[in-house]
């Protein structure tokens, strides 16, 4: 491989090429009348999806420079997806349009730094306007919750109503997870006991689902301890028993490091042991209580600690906890329990309620209520079915997007949907003046780009956007939308065409962030195959093995 430095108009042209690819490929999935995209896989059949994030990740241009730029676009989608799990298509539309407009101005000789400063100045004003437009969503108004989910699920009422039903059952503090159903073609909601806490996997090598970057273990044992584990010897007897059982193991400990962690990772990679490890939640006495909560929920006989005098070497499978399912992300762990009618769980809940009543500290009461909510709130499992594997995966993507959107709406409220929130917010830029001509260009770019999402939604419906946008603006009603599904003008909240304010905010913020970086990029260094490597079956740096791991 050799390095090539690309700059000037050649780089700007590449920016525009990739932005056009994104705008024509990712953007066509937007809205209830958006289209699906097929993504070829190295193995198996192509995946058919309307998930903008998946489509963006699937774009891999042949030219090395364009491929490098596309990966930066994909990172912007990834950031948006990580923060709210939705809004990636809107983010892609905004980013690509900002890049195209800014690149044209830079090619015309305008100062890129001044343009970026104008974009940043406009961003701050728009974010305040989005916040002022937001309306709080109440869990009592279950129809509003359903509408948020329906919109994000591309108009699927079954998905929206199922998510609303789940939220109603588990409440604001409850946990909702998604899994694929075996044998069913329907979307089902199953209520079970469980809990979620804010600790993720200790090593990415524990990941079982590389596409979603999560650990998913069915019917695992749970070893729960207050101790810090750094040597493997005390764990060997129970690990051998786990291997013989054929079931996975989840270890929750104060910390796991050194030899203990590396041995678990190596055995997991070799396929001999299905295992994952996470740090215990909380701190101090609160950590001890939360570990006891988890032990009660999973039916573990002990939380292993020095005071008990129980040695790790003497543990048997009967001493461990069990769960129906454990899902671990980089930030959270969700335990779905099989102990739904356990007397010990009920007794634990009553004990915490009693502590809340007798506590005189507001802080302690708050933490006790958090524990009570985790233990009693339950877990709603959305089981996604379908006639084929392709249908199940496509539907699961939409269910997860809708679930993330619903959570975001509960957090920061809702705004009119159908792309009008950004369109109406752009009006505040009429009074914003830049300190220079270039700054004003940046402000004008944002004003123009904020109409891109609604233009694309209308275009995907086969309609002319200019006429519709002109009518909406002239009515001077910030709750008026064009419903591309019903093909009529309507009040956003009456028609249920609403978006989570947080999703709109994050999509816009992320797009501005990525566009600002690319706008101020003068040169890029890219790797291209050298002449010797062009005839080689393997590119430079490729090896036939794993490097002797």
From Swiss-Prot:
Gene3D superfamilies: GroEL, GroEL-like equatorial domain, TCP-1-like chaperonin intermediate domain
A Pfam family: Cpn60_TCP1
GO cellular component, one term: cytoplasm
InterPro entries documented for this protein: Chaperonin_Cpn60_CS, Cpn60/GroEL, Cpn60/GroEL/TCP-1, GroEL-like_apical_dom_sf, GROEL-like_equatorial_sf, TCP-1-like_intermed_sf
Recorded catalytic activity of this chain's protein: ATP + H2O + a folded polypeptide = ADP + phosphate + an unfolded polypeptide
Enzyme Commission identifier(s): 5.6.1.7
Molecular function GO terms recorded: ATP binding; ATP-dependent protein folding chaperone; isomerase activity; unfolded protein binding
Top-tier EC class: isomerase
SUPFAM superfamilies: GroEL apical domain-like, GroEL equatorial domain-like, GroEL-intermediate domain like
Residues that, per the record, bind ATP: 29-32, 50, 86-90, 418, 499
GO biological process: protein refolding
Keywords, alphabetical: ATP-binding, Chaperone, Cytoplasm, Isomerase, Nucleotide-binding
Localization: Cytoplasm
Coarse class of the protein's main subcellular location: cytoplasm
Family: Belongs to the chaperonin (HSP60) family.
Role according to the record: Together with its co-chaperonin GroES, plays an essential role in assisting protein folding. The GroEL-GroES system forms a nano-cage that allows encapsulation of the non-native substrate proteins and provides a physical environment optimized to promote and accelerate protein folding.
Oligomer status and interactors: Forms a cylinder of 14 subunits composed of two heptameric rings stacked back-to-back. Interacts with the co-chaperonin GroES.
Protein name: Chaperonin GroEL
Native source organism of the sequence: Wolbachia pipientis wMel
Gene that this sequence comes from: groEL
């Amino acid at each position: 491989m050799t390095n090539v430095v690309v700059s000037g108009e050649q780089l700007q042209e590449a920016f525009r090429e990739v932005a056009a690819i994104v705008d024509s490929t990712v953007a066509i999935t937007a809205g209830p009348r958006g289209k699906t995209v097929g993504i070829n896989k190295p193995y198996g059949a192509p995946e058919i999806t309307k998930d903008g994030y998946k489509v963006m990740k699937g774009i891999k241009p042949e030219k090395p420079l364009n491929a490098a730029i596309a990966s930066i676009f994909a990172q912007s989608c990834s950031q948006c997806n990580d923060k709210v799990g939705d809004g990636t298509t809107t983010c892609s539309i905004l980013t690509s349009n900002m890049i195209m407009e800014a690149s044209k101005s830079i090619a015309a000789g305008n100062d890129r730094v001044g343009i970026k400063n104008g974009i940043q100045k406009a961003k701050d004003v728009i974010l305040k306007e989005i916040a002022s437009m937001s309306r709080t969503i109440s869990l009592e108004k279950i129809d509003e919750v359903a509408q948020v989910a329906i919109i994000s699920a591309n108009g699927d009422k079954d998905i929206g109503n199922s998510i609303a039903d789940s939220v109603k059952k588990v409440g604001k503090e409850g946990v909702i997870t998604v899994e694929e159903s075996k044998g069913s073609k329907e979307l089902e909601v199953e209520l079970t006991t469980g809990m979620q806490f804010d600790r993720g996997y200790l090593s990415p090598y524990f990941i079982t689902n590389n596409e979603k970057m999560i650990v998913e273990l069915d019917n695992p044992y749970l070893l729960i301890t207050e101790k810090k584990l750094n040597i493997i010897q005390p764990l060997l007897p129970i690990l051998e028993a786990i291997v013989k059982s054929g079931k996975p193991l989840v270890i929750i400990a104060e910390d796991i490091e050194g030899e203990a962690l590396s041995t678990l990772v190596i055995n997991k990679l070799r396929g001999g042991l299905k295992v994952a490890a996470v740090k215990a939640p909380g701190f101090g006495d609160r950590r001890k209580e939360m570990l006891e909560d988890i032990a009660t929920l999973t039916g573990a006989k002990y939380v292993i600690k020095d005071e008990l005098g129980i040695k790790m070497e003497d543990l048997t499978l009967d001493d461990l906890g069990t769960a129906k399912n454990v899902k671990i992300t980089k930030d959270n762990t969700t335990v779905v329990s099989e102990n739904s009618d356990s007397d010990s769980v009920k007794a634990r809940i009553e004990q915490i309620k009693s502590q809340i009543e007798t506590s005189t500290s507001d802080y302690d009461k708050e933490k006790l209520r958090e524990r009570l909510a985790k233990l009693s709130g339950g877990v709603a499992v959305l089981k996604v079915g379908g006639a084929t594997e392709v249908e199940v995966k496509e539907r699961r993507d939409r269910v997860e997007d809708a679930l993330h959107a619903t959570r975001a709406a509960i957090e920061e409220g809702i705004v009119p949907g159908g792309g009008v929130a950004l369109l109406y917010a752009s009006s505040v830029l009429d009074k914003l003046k830049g300190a220079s001509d270039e700054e004003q260009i940046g402000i004008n770019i944002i004003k123009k780009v904020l109409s891109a999402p609604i233009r694309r939604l209308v275009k995907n419906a086969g309609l002319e956007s200019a006429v519709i946008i002109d009518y909406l603006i002239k009515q001077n009603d910030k709750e008026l939308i064009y419903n591309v599904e019903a093909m009529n003008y309507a009040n956003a909240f009456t028609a249920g065409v609403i978006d989570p304010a947080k999703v709109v905010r994050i999509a816009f913020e992320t797009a501005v962030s990525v566009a600002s970086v690319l706008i101020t990029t003068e040169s890029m260094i890219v790797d291209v195959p050298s002449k010797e490597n062009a005839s080689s079956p393997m590119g430079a740096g490729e090896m036939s093995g794993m490097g002797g791991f």
